[in-house]
Amino acid sequence: MSESVTTGSDDDGGDRESSPVMLSQSFDPMSSSSNSSSEENSDDDYEKTISSKKRHPRPNSKGVNVKRSRRNAIVEEDPQEEIFNNLFAFLLDQKVDTMDIAVSWFADYAKDNQSALANLINFILKCCGCNRAINVFDVQDQDSASATLSQIQLSVERTSTRDYPLNSKNLKFRNFRKRLTGLLSNFVSQLSIRNYLYNSTVFEDIMSWVVAMSSSTMRPIRHTATVFCLNIMTFLCEKSKELLNEHAIATKQLEKEEKRSRVNRNRINELNNSLGEIVKQQDTLTTYLNDYFDSVFVHRYRDVEPKIRVDCLQELGVWINTVPSIFFSGSYLRYLGWMLSDINTTVRLTVVKVLRKFFETDSFIGGLRHFSSRFKERILEMSCVDADIGVRVASIRLCNAMRTCGFLENSEILKVLKLILDINPRVQREAVLFLCKVVDESVNEKIDLWGEEDYILKAFSQTSLTTFSVHWIKFSQMCKLLEEVRLSYQSSFDYDTLLRIFQKNGNFITPITQALLNACEIDSIYQSWEDISNFVLFDNYTSTLKDPIDSILSFCKLNDFQESILLQLLSASIQTVCNNNFITPKTVHNKQAAETTNDQNKDKDLLYLNLLPYINSITERNSASPTLLHDSLRLLFSMDLTEMTDPQLSRHFELLINNLKKFFLTNNDLQIIQGCTILFLRLDSIPALKEDLKLLVTDICDQTVTEFLKNFGSFNIQDAVITKDEFVIFEACLTRIEGCTSLKDFSDYPEFDIIYERLVSLLSRVPNSYEDTLKFSAINTLQSLLFWFFLRKDNPADEEKKKDDETKVFNCLINIMNNDSSKILQLQAARTFLETVIMKEGVKASHYNDDNRVSEEHNFLKPQFLDALLKILEGWLYTYAKVGQFPFKRLTQASSPHTQISLDKNPLNRRLLEHVCCDLTSKLLIVVSLSNTITPEFSQQFCELRGHYGPKLSAIVDEFLN
Amino acid sequence: MTGLNETDARILVTSRHLFLWPLAETYFKNAEKVLQDCGVCDSFGRLLSTGLQCLYSVLMDTKMEPRVELLTRKRICEVLLSHTVEYADVEAILNRALIIAEQHNLTEYKFSLQLLLSRVFCRTSPKAAKVLLTRCVREAEEYAKVAEIYHSNNQSNPHRWVYEFLLATLEFQNVSQVANSIHNYANHHKHQHLQLLAMILNQSLPMDEISTDSDQISILCLVTQIAQCLRKGEILLAREILPKIHSKLESETFVWPSSYIDFFIDDTSKISIKWMSINQLYLLIYLISGFCYISDSTSGRASRFLQEGLRITGDFKHQERCVLEYLESQKWINNITKDMKYYLIATYLSRSRLSKAERILQSTEDDQTGFLGILKGMYLQKRGDLKKAEVHYRETAKNFSFRTDTFIISTLNLINILEDSAAASRCLESIEPLCNKHEKKIFKLWLLVLKVIREGPQVHQSNVLPRVIQQSSEYANTQLQYISLTELSERFGKLEHAEKMAISALELAKKSKDELWCLISGRILEDFYRSVQKYDKMRQQALENSAYSKLIEDIYSFV
């Protein structure tokens, strides 16, 4: 076999304990992966190393002086002149068929084999972007191939270019690779047809040059030659596969012939000879494949050029699929396993895609268990923390294929399922797809255990459980799995408090809900909101002493947490159905669009008419459980209430409103009260309900004010000790007053001053983390009161009073921002301060045009205020950096250390903290812009944030800077 | 190769398997003999290794036919799986063989290889085994459909592989599920033998006599029927079946060719299932026989069966032909020996053979079933050491609460000796739901009796006790009979029935050598005679009671 050009420290293909290029274990998942083009590696070090070890060419024993003089002539040739090669020209000519090119070469070879061979080698050199040529004398001695190539390489190095056909963007090379592949396919085919592959040395002669080139220190030559060799091996594999089929056919024919009662000896001998020939050819191909694998692949799969590595691994995947009898074994799979840790993204992605095909091939399952046990940890790691999103997504798909084969344990499946809460939407969606597959598989197992779907339906049809659906099993399994995923992340008080702040407007979608929305898009069964509703309302779990009914009902019975997830599934289902069914096609003609709109309106009314009674029933059923009731109310958040105009809905709305009133006034759970408030605000947009709702809100507010005065009227807020029981009462009362101030203008109330004073006093209490929730409500209530203030067009006599009130509130907020020990309360105070300023500026724009007043309002953003805000923002960025594992970037010069709140490093917390930081940053930048206090130092501070905390925050900063 | 032409020489070279295969099998057979004679030893390993080397030598031939390679690899895997735990090697060899089968469309061979692969996966990756077998069942069903259409006569019954794969799923599926699958498939294709197999696996055989030409299947069916009866506590019915087994075993025409039982799909195709050797069968029959009569404390039949079974365990000869089966058989014999000891102890205790029971107890090691704890408690209770007995019962109930049978038995015994009525009532309440739901009705009967006893003779329970007495006869539980009769006679007072019941109870207790209950029932009889002024009978009974009292005092003096 031919020798390599160089004799470096290449591995001989033995078993390896470690991968050739180790991937760093401390990847930053938030940073974007660098492009392959930016990873163009310099060949200088490699070439220097190779050059220092280069052998001197062996002296030619023949001593032909003419050859030496001709080699010298090659070097002396004018390098600028373009050397013509007919094969290369034909290849670039799109009109010439590649088969014709191959056939013409063989015709030339039949006439003059040496010239044809030299022409072919020159063709290969042209494909390498090498403007050099050899002559017939060089191909006469195959042993001199390495020496000849060395000389060519030396002459080309001085004029080398990085642009060569395989990676060129020149238009004339746009189909180069595709046509080259076709040409090589036809070439190998012709070699086989003409028996040159088995009975001639021409193939070996050609390959000796190709193998020598594949070890060149020049990248264009090395890459192109490697591609030649890999493609040729691919086509040899295809030929080997054909021979295997022929072998099988001949074997069967021989068996049949031998079993005949009247044996045909001639036919048997003929078949035996045919079999012998096939076996011989198979052996020849197998020898070729093994030799070229050892000569080329073993070295090039570790090449410094990522493209070469990618090509090697892609072709290895093809070989394994084509000829598994040769390549599907641990000896070859391990190369793929090692390259899972390659530093290049494209290489890793290629390996993952190749492996997924293997795991999706049923016949390969027997040979993949050992590979799985060895490399699945790495694959799971790639799914969870790889730097490139594309690789992560592909790895999750690979994990799904591995799971389908049974190679993932339950704990490993859970690791992937956790990714449904990942911060990246693509990863989320792929993980949800994985989740749906897991659920389907589990459900099918359960149904098989209980006796198939038809049997189950028949059993239930004989009972009084008429609302039962087999899909309940699926919904139940989904809820149980999501519970397991959710509980794997430890929830903390700080997380819950932050979540409450940002759920205030009802538009915040929880990660679980987002996952379920994705599931609804993936599997239409989850859009069956009627089935889900019936499942939610079902409560007849008493034993019927009938199997499998009891087993199924026992399985479908959910605990509170699981029911909460089920309600979120129902919410996602409703959202998906509404979004999917009521989107007007853009291409529809106007008239048709009008008709479609009318039909959709009718469908929508019908949907709401069917849906609202279910929701009323669900809320009534779950009224005893605060958590479930909150999730039930959130079902209404999924619906566009302004679209509900059907008169038949009024009865259901009346019931809903009465229920909401009852929940608001009697329930002490903060989330319930907030939910009712949001729904009242939304229901107010329905014209038919305005009058009734107005009366109801007035009644609610009156009762709430009475309650507030009863609790706080004579209570020494600033100094008194609040007991546990009092705390619960106060918390609920303040939450209700917060809701009422959102619903109605309180400035007309005679008790307004007392309420205002009490709330300000509450904010002035000594900081106590136990009472933070009381201050949250107080802050929000004061904000609402100020909002109503700003909206009123008062006479000038009230301006002074308004200013005094504003000053009191702002002073309290500043005091909290500077002095309170609760960082979450500081955050809330900062957000309220910023929102109030933004709100005031917005109201002012519609009320005042006096420039003097504008200048007066800027006094609110005093330097000490700005410093306090920046300090708070920096603290949250510090926490976000810790949780998200980013490098922390300071905003201020303050030397005091930052303390991190108690949030674990998991995707849930990272998502929430991202939201917090983006919200706070955007509001701060808006206020600074409005106040016209931007300084170069300030801009510089925020400019440095770009790229450090993820794309969302960077986008906000970019918008500000622009 | 002097004198051989090129063609003959080539044939000889490429046909080396014709020589090496038989040679390898010779080594394997000799290894099996060594295994049966000496167990796992060095010579066995050497013989096995040499045989494998012969097969590996066949694989060295690069010109062998694909079928030869496939069969050689298959045989290597079978040997490795039977005698070693070299699963990685088996996987690699099987992988190549599967590829060959796939390439050459050798479907039957592919199925057999997949079956071997599933055995590997069952040990290395159970989930993968489940996936593999699920796919294989589906493939085999499709293959069977196609084969039926084309009526291929050159191959074995195509349905065979469906059954093979279904049976292989027993490794990770419960028996009833697998049995149902087999039953459905066999019922659809009218494979009667396989329907029978499904019923055996599901333990749902009808109690009628099963007509079959195979002695092995006949014995298997009878044993299954007995197991069904014992599971429900129907001892009398089990005793009726037992003579049929004995008769079959003693028959001159009885044949037990091997440990494998064949279930025929058609006249030629069959499924062979490993059950047990003839030696194992005799041990099992002795155990079953002893168990059937263990509740009959009036005779020593149970102890005789169990003693004989224990005796022949010492002479047990292994007939297994592979290491894994040998190890499994050894484990089986250890377990059955332990079971026989336990039941023998129980038999001795029920007949007050305390010295014999003590001797076996001292030589018995602790187990993981909790049954030994109950036996120790029973022994101490018989000796009159109620406090220590209570400790054993409580510990057993606490430590083995997850085993329903053990928990119920230990708690019932505990209730029987508790002096604290409140504690006894709490125990009764704790096990009442379990007894009511349990398949063995005997537990419920015992519960009822204990409740009646605890309520005292003042409460006239005219319905419960007669029902218990009747059902205890059906379940052939002698102890339950005489205890119930004693309690019922006490409640009848001066009625004539009281005498009859007391006499019956006394007779049963005498036969069971239960001195304590002899004394109790004797005193009831004595009181009855006094109440009806039959003073001669009263004095005679008083003398007997005095003797029993003396015996009991002697027993308690050792405490």
From Swiss-Prot, chain A:
Residues 21-30 have a biased composition (Polar residues). Keywords: Cell cycle, Cell division, Centromere, Chromosome, Chromosome partition, Coiled coil, Mitosis, Nucleus. Residues 51-71 have a biased composition (Basic residues). It holds the Pfam family HEAT_SCC3-SA. The keyword Cell cycle applies. SUPFAM superfamilies: ARM repeat (SSF48371). It is found in: Nucleus; Chromosome, Centromere. One of its GO terms (biological process) is mitotic sister chromatid cohesion, centromeric. The keyword Ligase does not apply. Gene3D superfamilies: Leucine-rich Repeat Variant (1.25.10.10). Residues 236-275 form a coiled coil. GO terms for molecular function: chromatin binding; DNA binding. Its main location: nucleus. Residues 1-72 are annotated as: Disordered. Component of cohesin complex, a complex required for the cohesion of sister chromatids after DNA replication. The cohesin complex apparently forms a large proteinaceous ring within which sister chromatids can be trapped. At anaphase, the rad21 subunit of the cohesin complex is cleaved and dissociates from chromatin, allowing sister chromatids to segregate. The cohesin complex may also play a role in spindle pole assembly during mitosis. Belongs to the SCC3 family. Cohesin complexes are composed of the psm1/smc1 and psm3/smc3 heterodimer attached via their hinge domain, rad21/scc1 which link them, and psc3/scc3, which interacts with rad21. Interacts with swi6. The interaction with swi6 may contribute to recruit cohesin complex to heterochromatin. This is Cohesin subunit psc3. The gene is psc3.
Swiss-Prot record, chain B:
It is found in: Nucleus. GO terms for molecular function: cohesin loader activity; double-stranded DNA binding. It comes from the Eukaryota. GO terms for cellular component: chromatin; cytosol; nucleus; Scc2-Scc4 cohesin loading complex; SMC loading complex. The keyword Isomerase does not apply. The keyword Nucleus applies. Keywords: Cell cycle, Cell division, Chromosome partition, Mitosis, Nucleus. One of its GO terms (biological process) is mitotic sister chromatid cohesion. It holds the Pfam family Cohesin_load. Belongs to the SCC4/mau-2 family. Involved in sister chromatid cohesion. Forms a complex with mis4, which is required for the association of the cohesin complex with chromosomes. Interacts with mis4 and rad21. This is MAU2 chromatid cohesion factor homolog. The gene is ssl3.
